[in-house]
Amino acid sequence: MFDSSLITYAVSLHFSQKVNDIVISTLQAIADETGNRFMIENKIPPHITIGAFHAAREEAAKLLQLVEDFARDQKAGSVQFSEVGDFNGKVLFLQPEKNLFLSKINNELHTLLLPEFEKAENGYYLPDIWFPHTTLATRLNQSQFSAAEEIAKKISLPLEAPIEELAVYQ
């Protein structure tokens, strides 16, 4: 059972400005066409979440320090977005190839943090079941989905996305 005194922390990868510009212009076009402004209004930056963990408030500094040290030790990497995908016609995303860089960073993060902190998000980011993606639109109805998908298909794929930063969100 979930302990409501715990805080959820998401660890995410961020892209180069060039890739961000492509994704953000797509988010904006989808919002303008469909009226679904969730991604824009919530100021969600383009990212790939590589882990989500619960921590008590008094353990936050420890988690943040572990992630900061982990980020410092990472080698440069990139992902290649190869297709547009969806979750049940409700979420539209860019799907990267699950390459060695992504698999390794996801696995190593969990190896480091799971002994200390509880998994969050029903374990969706655990290495064996993780499905890396960058959300373009979420909470779509059927007509919004069709319009959003047409816009997303205009992104020139494959798209090479250098990773510029590893960040933590609450």
How would you describe each model-predicted region?
Residues 1-78, 101-160:
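Basic, often amphipathic N-terminal segments
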Residues 10, 91, 165:
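Short hydrophobic/aromatic beta-strand or adjacent loop that forms the aromatic wall/cage
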Residues 50, 93-94, 136, 168:
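Short hydrophobic/aromatic-rich beta-strand segments that constitute the beta-sheet cores
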Residues 80-82:
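Short, surface-exposed loop motifs enriched in S/T, G, D/E and P with embedded aromatic residues
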Residues 84-87, 164-170:
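Glycine-rich beta-strand-turn "strand-cap" elements at beta-sheet edges
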Residues 87-90, 129-130:
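Acidic/polar active-site rim loop that often engages polyanionic ligands
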Residues 90-100:
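Short, low-order "capping/linker" segments at domain edges
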